[in-house]
């Protein structure tokens, strides 16, 4: 289940977001047993969730984008006063076109523990290069009360992959993803780390419980119950990589199934096999 949650960091002087989730109105995924990823159903729109925490868009001062994909960057335009920090290698991505106030991160502050390249964003908040999932993938670490909170974007989709030391989601650079995974695991073994994934319920549970990741003692997996009986077929398909929605009504009525086999996602260039029913 491809849950995508994002994080707010309130320093007392600033309100900092890590990613901004899917855009408002994004369609629910249609569960299919053969689909590579189930995008899931919306629980709450991102901006509504932020308002429920007591924050207005104008209060947000910085947004730290782990990577370009639409399920992490969907609401960037909703924050008029925020500087948007993103790895300079992601600049120019279709998902970031026409986004104002982007600050390219050049990792000018040297090493952060065993990670060779980092940039300090605020007191106790660090932007760290973590290439692999995308060429510009990054992770964020926030230090608080002796703990290291790691907001890792899509280095893993689920904690089970981290425990098993397996690469699960790599789109751009397999070798770099392996190096990043090795560094993440090394860091966790030596520093008390709360591992906050965006695509698993364990991310929220780890954060709420301040649960320090122990690689030798995995937390038991609780499988979600999914109803595969399905709703009516809308004819729409969504890219499981970048969130691009294919709607036949916007393409002269051409059904997704009738597109040529060599057709690619207009945004991220992934093949048809990466699309799920919406």
Predicted regions and their residues:
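Cys/His-rich metal-chelating microdomains
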Residues: 245, 249, 262, 271-274
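Short cysteine-rich clusters marking metal-coordination/redox-active sites
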Residues: 239-242, 265-268
């Amino acid at each position: 289940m491809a849950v995508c949650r994002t994080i707010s960091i309130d320093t007392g002087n600033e309100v900092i977001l890590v990613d901004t989730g899917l855009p408002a109105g994004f369609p629910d995924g249609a569960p299919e047993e053969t689909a590579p990823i189930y995008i899931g159903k919306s629980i709450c729109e991102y901006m509504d969730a932020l308002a429920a925490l007591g924050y207005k868009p104008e209060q947000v001062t910085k947004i730290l984008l782990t990577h370009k994909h639409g399920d992490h960057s969907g609401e960037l335009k909703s924050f008029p006063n925020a500087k948007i920090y993103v790895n300079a290698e992601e600049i120019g991505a279709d998902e970031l076109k026409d986004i104002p106030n982007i600050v390219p991160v050049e990792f000018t502050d040297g090493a952060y523990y065993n990670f060779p390249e980092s940039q300090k964003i605020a007191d106790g908040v660090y932007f760290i290069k973590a290439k692999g999932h995308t060429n510009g993938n990054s992770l964020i670490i926030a230090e608080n009360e002796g703990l290291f909170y790691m907001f890792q974007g899509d280095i893993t989709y689920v904690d089970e992959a981290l425990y098993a030391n397996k690469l699960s989601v790599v789109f751009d650079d397999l070798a770099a993803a392996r190096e990043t995974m090795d560094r993440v695991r090394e860091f966790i073994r030596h520093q008390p780390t709360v591992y906050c994934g965006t695509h698993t319920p364990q991310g929220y549970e780890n954060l709420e419980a301040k649960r320090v990741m122990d690689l030798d003692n995995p937390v038991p997996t609780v499988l979600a119950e999914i109803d595969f009986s399905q709703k009516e077929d809308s004819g729409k398909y969504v890219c499981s990589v970048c969130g691009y929605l294919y709607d036949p009504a916007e393409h002269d009525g051409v059904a997704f199934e009738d597109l040529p086999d060599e057709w690619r996602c207009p945004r991220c260039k992934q093949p048809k096999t990466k699309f799920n029913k919406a």
